[in-house]
């Protein structure tokens, strides 16, 4: 196969993707709108394409770039000379390493001999921390939040105890853009000798320039670590994130090292051994090109667009913005205070917006442990490029709202009634073929098919079925998507 044919096929495959530039996808994509920054990042990645990030003593450029990126992040995020850090492959790895570090340090203190360490966080904390608890054997203690998405500091503080290895707060939370009460929680954690991590993966490179934000970063007493994604509002290619840790001795627990094999001595600061230096080089180049002033200018654009969109959504009868979002993201829910024929279901709204050329992110509701329920919402992430399409986007949001006004949400009972007879009673532990049969039965898997164009019924199904079942079915759906075709 010729090189040109290969590239042509890749271009054809890419044409089926959601657009990564232009502001038409309001999740997953962090577009600065600066073509020269994209070109700089690509050139930097090309220069280090053969470099193995495993060993910064052999490839010394890796050590220099990582040191300079960490230094910039430390200065931006309120750290002092006692703060050290690493560049990871993404927010999930940063979160995993923060939990692993805290767990190992907790074990070293032996405050609860024989106990299972506990990870304490609001229920809105990123799912990466659920993964971390699962991987590293911590009990996950998720605290319910208010209908606004905000968590009470007291609700977290009263659950602290000697078995808590780490408390996590968000700056802001992804689902609702709520800024957790970081100063109060960190102070209480410090008083009990508990590590406190700030997950600023989505906000870390933007909130330093945002208006009227409560203290949230490493300048807050009691904060022991912080994560901030370079591949979000640091505008770097996937995947690059920074994990900052307070105290060299604390941070060394993040590392893995062994000389107990007949090969080369292994020392890994992060989860991976061999890894591409490309995302690091791109992030390093962008940090130097933009500097604080460049990031501030891009954040200002995000803030203007966010303010405009919050005002617009608030003006649409039947919709409401959830809580008081902090940063360039927001969640939109149905306004139950208006008559039923004036209400707008956020999932039908998102589907209608998609049909008109913009992609929003549907979020299911959640039944919390205290019996309260968080409503279904639609999520929007705002980037600098949003400002250039703001008029078109606003017109689409309004027109889509009118198109679905009064259409009731998908009824969970109707969703369950459409399932094959007796399915829920006979499932037990699903094997792969049974899971596939269920997916086919509900129309989610067919030859060449992706997810449905209308996602509201799909989200209603997720909400209606037991969580372990939906998790198993979604696992099968994603696994089948990347299996070799027969």
Locate predicted features.
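Active-site C-terminal subdomain of aminotransferase-like
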Residues: 212, 216-328, 332-342
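Conserved PLP-enzyme active-site core in the AAT-like
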Residues: 89-257, 263-269
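Short loop-beta-helix segment that forms the pyridoxal 5′-phosphate
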Residues: 73-98
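Active-site nucleophile and cofactor-binding loops and adjacent substrate-binding regions
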Residues: 58-62, 85-92, 121, 323
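Alpha-helical scaffolding segments of alpha/beta enzyme cores, especially the outer helices
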Residues: 184-187, 191, 308, 348, ...
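Short Gly/Ser/Thr- and Asp/Glu-enriched loop/turn motifs at secondary-structure junctions
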Residues: 81-82, 323-329, 373-375
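Non-catalytic terminal extensions of PLP-dependent enzymes
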Residues: 1-63, 67-71, 333-486
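Short beta-strand
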Residues: 87, 320-325, 362-364, 370-371
């Amino acid at each position: 196969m010729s090189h040109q044919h290969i590239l042509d096929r890749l271009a054809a495959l890419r044409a089926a993707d959601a657009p990564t530039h232009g502001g038409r996808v309001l999740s997953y994509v962090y577009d600065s709108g600066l073509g020269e920054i994209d070109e700089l990042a690509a050139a930097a990645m090309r220069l280090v394409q053969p470099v193995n990030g495993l060993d910064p003593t052999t490839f010394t450029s890796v050590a220099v770039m990582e040191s300079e990126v960490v230094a910039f992040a430390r200065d931006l995020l309120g750290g002092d000379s006692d703060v050290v850090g690493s560049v990871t492959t993404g927010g999930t790895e940063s979160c995993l390493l923060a939990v692993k570090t805290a767990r190992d340090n907790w074990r070293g203190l032996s405050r609860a001999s024989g106990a299972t360490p506990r990870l304490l966080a609001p229920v809105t904390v990123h799912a990466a921390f659920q993964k971390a608890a699962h991987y590293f054997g911590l009990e996950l203690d998720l605290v319910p939040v208010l209908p606004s998405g905000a968590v009470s500091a007291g609700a977290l503080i009263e659950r602290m105890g000697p078995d808590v290895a780490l408390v996590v707060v968000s700056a802001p939370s992804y689902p609702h853009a709520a800024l957790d009460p970081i100063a109060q929680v960190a102070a209480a954690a410090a008083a009990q000798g508990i590590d406190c991590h700030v997950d600023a993966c989505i906000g870390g490179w933007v909130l330093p320039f945002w208006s009227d934000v409560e203290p949230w970063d490493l300048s807050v007493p009691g904060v022991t670590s912080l994560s901030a994604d370079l591949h979000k509002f640091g505008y770097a290619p996937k995947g690059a994130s920074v994990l900052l840790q307070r105290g060299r001795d604390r941070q060394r627990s993040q590392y893995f090292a062994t000389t107990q094999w007949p090969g080369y001595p292994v020392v890994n600061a992060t989860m991976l051994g061999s890894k591409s230096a490309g995302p690091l080089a791109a992030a390093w180049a962008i940090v130097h090109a933009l500097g604080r002033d460049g990031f501030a200018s891009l954040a200002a654009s995000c803030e203007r667009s966010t303010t405009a969109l919050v005002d617009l959504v608030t003006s649409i009868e039947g919709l409401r913005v959830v809580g008081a979002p902090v940063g360039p993201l927001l969640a939109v829910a149905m306004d139950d205070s208006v008559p039923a024929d004036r209400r707008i279901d956020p999932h039908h709204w998102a589907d209608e917006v998609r049909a008109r050329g913009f992609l929003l992110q549907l979020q299911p509701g959640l039944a919390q442990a205290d019996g309260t329920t968080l409503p279904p919402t639609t999520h929007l992430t705002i980037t600098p490029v949003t400002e250039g399409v703001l008029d078109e986007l606003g017109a689409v949001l309004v027109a889509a709202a009118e198109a679905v006004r009064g259409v009731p949400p998908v009824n969970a009972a109707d969703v369950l009634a459409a399932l094959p007879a007796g399915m829920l009673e006979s499932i037990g532990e699903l094997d792969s073929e049974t899971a596939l049969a269920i997916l086919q039965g509900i129309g989610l898997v067919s030859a060449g098919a992706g997810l449905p164009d209308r996602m509201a019924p799909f989200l209603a199904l997720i909400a209606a079925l037991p969580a372990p079942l939906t998790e198993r079915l979604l696992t099968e759906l994603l696994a089948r998507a990347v299996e070799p075709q027969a």
